[in-house]
Curated annotation (Swiss-Prot):
This is Small ribosomal subunit protein bS18. GO terms for biological process: translation. Part of the 30S ribosomal subunit. Forms a tight heterodimer with protein bS6. Keywords: Ribonucleoprotein, Ribosomal protein, RNA-binding, rRNA-binding. InterPro entries: Ribosomal_bS18 (IPR001648), Ribosomal_bS18_CS (IPR018275), Ribosomal_bS18_sf (IPR036870). Binds as a heterodimer with protein bS6 to the central domain of the 16S rRNA, where it helps stabilize the platform of the 30S subunit. The keyword 4Fe-4S does not apply. It comes from Aeromonas hydrophila subsp. hydrophila (strain ATCC 7966 / DSM 30187 / BCRC 13018 / CCUG 14551 / JCM 1027 / KCTC 2358 / NCIMB 9240 / NCTC 8049). SUPFAM superfamilies: Ribosomal protein S18.
Amino acid sequence: MARYFRRRKFCRFTAENVTEIDYKDIVTLKNYITESGKIVPSRITGTRAKYQRQLARAIKRARYLALLPYTDLHNK
């Protein structure tokens, strides 16, 4: 019987010594939203609580300024 190996989650922001997550950094923010536009939870990404709050705030600001979409493209 094969053993399933789960890779340990780690916080990328802690590893890179990020002080604050910027709402203008769209490339980073896109990694933390789903295809439908939802914010990915920290239990999936491994992000620490401090950075998850900053991430959510930055994504919401970017959405408000139309830098990120609220939802997907709704292609039919």
